[in-house]
Each structure stands twice: as structure tokens, then as C-alpha cells.
């Protein structure tokens, strides 16, 4: 039996190897074979990479472009063709810190030693981004396996492999979908350490804060989504302690950890805001101008103040996302599943589970999975409520948003609920901690 550190290192290496294999076999690094997602936003990263490649600098270190129209493909061409550019022509995009641009810019400069061709370096960056996303999803699947068993983990991970928009979008250099999962991974690690050691190590709290800070430095969009993702494992643990193990004190302890994780997450968000403000100050030269630009960026994205951006209300946005979008969330050959169809199916399965478990007097065991499912639905829906104009405009985000975390949770819980309904199985689904 290997020591725990060696087991952890071996597991991480195996996850990275499998993630790299999946990226290669499924051609996720190829813009030609699996397509691209949001070229309009990704061009901001290409501009920043090209700026670093040219050895140029601008105050603040933001993403940006060298063209007046930043929604076209010109900046990507500048990067791929190594076209010389004028430093004064760079237009910074100041609505976020742009950490992903700095990160990929550094990696790109390293890749130049082996890949002088711009197209080859672009493919390598896509490959890295997709591999990191698969690795994050595999780590989540391992946590699901530990708690619910291999079948639930397989169903959850299958939702990634069968999601056409994830397969296309995981390579995107702007959105960096693997960073959306960092807060969730941090709290999953917190729960794991707590269960193994009997108490929460102090280092877990700054880890949660750092995960949220990194995500926010790559963009504050969908902030409520990944903050709710961050709390799902802890809410599940609290519900399981109260309803399944009948341990009110244990439930209160887990609720305290939920609050602690929330405070840590908000601390990470605050740190990201402070760094963003410092960048704005460097860019605009004064605190007043920096504050004005920040508040304008925020008010354009908050439902209470975004009326000037687009005249739309929250029910309209919810209808657009739930009912009007016909984009498939899951695709298996000719069979596709939309958000509305998956929601109805999940509600039907849930209703049957409630009836069966009530008859078998095991309804209490349904509460924790139902809380997980409800939070999985609330995570994407919360952004539609918080930022209705942004959600209404960016229709290409509609099918992607559901995968954080409504789709994988709905798939994961199918075998969990089936296990609860099988006659003769009344013991706990997971080991108690």
C-alpha cells in the first residue's frame, strides 16, 4: 500500500494522462474537427498573447485588441502569422483582470522554442486548455465515485462526453471552462480532508479563496454560478448528516463549514476586485477614473441597473433559456436532449422516487440528493436572474451554462435514485463521516 502522498501523486498523474488521451482522441484541440465557440471574445486573448509576443506593454496588463472592431478574426490572424504591430494601436479590454491572457501569453512564449508556426502554437494552447478541463471533470468524477459509486461517476462524466457545446467550447481561451470548476474542486478537497482527518485543515479555507480569486481574474461573468457550485458539496454533507444520519449537531458543524466556505469564496472575490481596481488605476491614471469604469462595467451586468443595455425582464430570460432554446445539451447519435426535456425527465424521475421512497419509509434519504439537484439547477439559473441583459444578449452561452451544474448532476443522480428505489437496499449510499 502506497503512502497517501504517493497515492495522491499517482492519481493526479493518471488523471492528467487520461485527460490528455481524451483531448487527443476526441480532437478537442482541433478548431477544424470540433469547431470553436466564441470567436468574438477569444480575440481579446489573441490580442494580449500577440502583445506579449511582440514584447510590448500597456498599463494594467489587460486583454485587448489591435483593431477597432474586436469581434472579427483579425487579431487571431496577427497572432498566427506573427505580424508586426504598433504598440499604440492596442486597445485594452478593462472589464476584467485578464489573467488567462497573461497565462497563455507565457505559455505561448515557451512554446515558441519548439513550435515556431503560429497555427501549431494555437493548437497546442487549445490542447492544453481542453486537457485541463478534462482533468478538472475527472477529479469531480472521482469525488462522485467516492461518495456515490462508480456508476454515478460514469453517468456524470458521460454528460461531458455527450455534450456538443462542451466538446466545442472547452478549448476556448477566453472562457477557460476549467477555471469554472476550481471553486467546486476546492470545496470537494475540503470535504475529503475533513472526512479523512475528522476536522477541516486550516489550509482548505485559503484554497477556496484562491480558487474563486483565480476564476474571477479570468472574468466575473457567471459569478453566482460558480459560487453556488462551491457550496453544493457542503450543503449535501449537512443535509446527509441531518436527514440520513439523524445527527443535528453534525449538520450544524457542516453548516458552519458551509458558511466558512462562503466567506472564503467572497474573500477571494474581494481580492480579485482589489487587483482589478489596481489594474484600472494603472491603466487610467487615477482612482476616480478607475472607479467610474469599474462601476459602469458592473451596472451594465446587474439586473437592477442593466435596463439601458437591453429592455428585457427576468421571466423573458428564463423562458429563453428553459423553453425557447432548442440547442441540444446532450447528443448521442440522432438522439438529442434539450434543457426543457431534461428538466421534465428529471422532475418525472424525482416524482417516482418520492412515491417509491415514501412507500418504503426511506424518503429521508432522498433529501440530500434533491438538495444537490436543486442547487445544480439554481447555479445556472441564478445568473439569468442576476444579469438578465447579459444572459439575453449572449445567446451562445445558453447551452453551455446548463453544464454548470444542472446537466451533470441530473445524469449523476439517475443511478443514485435507482439504487434508492431497488427493493431491499435500505443502507446508506455512502460511508458516514
Model-derived regions, located:
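Transmembrane alpha-helix segments characteristic
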Residues: 361-390
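Membrane-interface alpha helices of multi-pass inner-membrane proteins
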Residues: 203-222, 226, 264-265
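Short hydrophobic/aromatic helix or loop-helix immediately within or flanking a transmembrane segment
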Residues: 82-123
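Aromatic- and kink-enriched transmembrane "portal" helix at the membrane-lumen/periplasm boundary
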Residues: 118-126, 156-182, 212-213, 217, ...
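Hydrophobic, aromatic-rich transmembrane alpha-helices
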Residues: 136-141, 327-367, 414
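Hydrophobic/aromatic-rich transmembrane helices and adjacent perimembrane loops
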Residues: 178-181, 391-421
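Transmembrane-helix motifs of polytopic, lipid-linked glycan transferases
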Residues: 124-152, 357
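Membrane-lumen/periplasm interface segments of specific transmembrane helices
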Residues: 258-346
Amino acid at each position: 500500500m502506497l503512502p497517501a502522498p504517493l497515492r495522491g501523486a499517482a492519481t493526479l498523474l493518471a488523471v492528467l494522462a487520461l485527460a490528455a488521451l481524451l483531448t487527443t482522441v476526441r480532437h478537442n484541440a482541433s478548431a477544424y474537427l470540433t469547431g470553436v465557440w466564441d470567436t468574438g471574445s477569444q480575440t481579446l486573448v489573441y490580442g494580449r498573447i500577440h502583445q506579449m509576443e511582440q514584447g510590448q506593454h500597456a498599463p494594467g496588463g489587460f486583454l485587448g485588441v489591435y483593431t477597432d472592431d474586436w469581434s472579427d478574426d483579425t487579431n487571431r490572424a496577427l497572432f498566427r502569422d506573427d505580424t508586426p504591430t504598433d504598440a499604440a494601436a492596442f486597445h485594452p479590454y478593462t472589464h476584467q483582470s485578464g489573467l488567462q491572457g497573461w497565462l497563455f501569453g507565457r505559455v505561448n512564449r515557451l512554446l515558441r522554442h519548439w513550435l515556431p508556426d503560429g497555427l501549431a502554437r494555437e493548437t497546442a494552447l487549445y490542447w492544453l486548455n481542453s486537457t485541463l478541463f478534462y482533468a478538472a471533470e475527472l477529479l469531480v468524477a472521482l469525488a462522485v465515485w467516492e461518495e456515490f459509486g462508480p456508476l454515478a461517476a460514469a453517468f456524470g462524466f458521460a454528460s461531458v462526453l455527450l455534450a456538443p457545446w462542451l466538446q466545442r467550447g472547452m478549448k476556448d481561451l477566453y472562457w477557460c471552462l476549467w477555471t469554472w470548476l476550481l471553486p467546486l474542486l476546492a470545496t470537494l478537497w475540503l470535504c475529503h480532508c475533513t472526512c479523512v482527518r475528522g476536522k477541516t485543515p486550516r489550509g482548505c479555507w485559503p484554497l477556496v479563496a484562491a480558487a474563486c480569486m483565480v476564476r474571477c481574474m479570468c472574468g466575473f461573468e457567471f459569478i453566482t454560478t460558480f459560487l453556488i457550485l462551491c457550496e453544493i458539496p457542503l450543503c449535501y454533507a449537512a443535509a446527509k448528516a441531518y436527514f440520513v444520519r439523524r445527527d443535528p449537531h453534525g449538520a450544524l458543524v457542516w453548516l458552519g463549514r458551509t458558511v466558512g466556505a462562503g466567506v472564503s469564496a467572497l474573500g477571494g472575490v474581494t481580492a480579485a476586485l482589489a487587483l482589478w481596481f489596481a489594474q484600472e488605476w494603472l491603466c487610467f491614471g487615477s482612482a476616480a477614473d478607475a472607479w467610474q469604469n469599474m462601476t459602469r462595467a458592473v451596472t451594465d451586468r446587474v439586473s437592477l441597473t442593466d435596463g439601458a443595455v437591453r429592455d428585457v425582464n427576468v421571466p423573458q430570460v428564463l423562458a429563453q433559456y428553459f423553453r425557447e432554446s432548442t440547442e441540444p445539451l446532450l447528443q448521442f447519435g440522432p438522439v438529442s436532449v434539450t434543457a426543457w426535456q431534461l428538466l421534465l425527465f428529471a422532475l418525472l424521475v424525482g416524482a417516482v422516487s418520492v412515491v417509491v421512497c415514501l412507500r418504503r419509509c426511506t424518503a429521508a434519504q432522498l433529501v440530500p440528493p434533491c438538495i444537490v439537484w436543486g442547487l445544480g439547477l439554481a447555479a445556472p439559473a441564478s445568473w439569468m436572474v442576476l444579469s438578465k441583459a447579459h444572459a439575453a444578449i449572449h445567446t451562445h452561452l445558453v447551452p453551455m451554462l446548463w453544464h454548470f451544474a444542472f446537466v451533470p448532476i441530473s445524469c449523476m443522480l439517475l443511478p443514485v435514485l435507482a439504487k434508492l428505489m431497488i427493493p431491499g437496499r435500505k443502507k446508506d449510499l455512502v460511508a458516514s463521516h
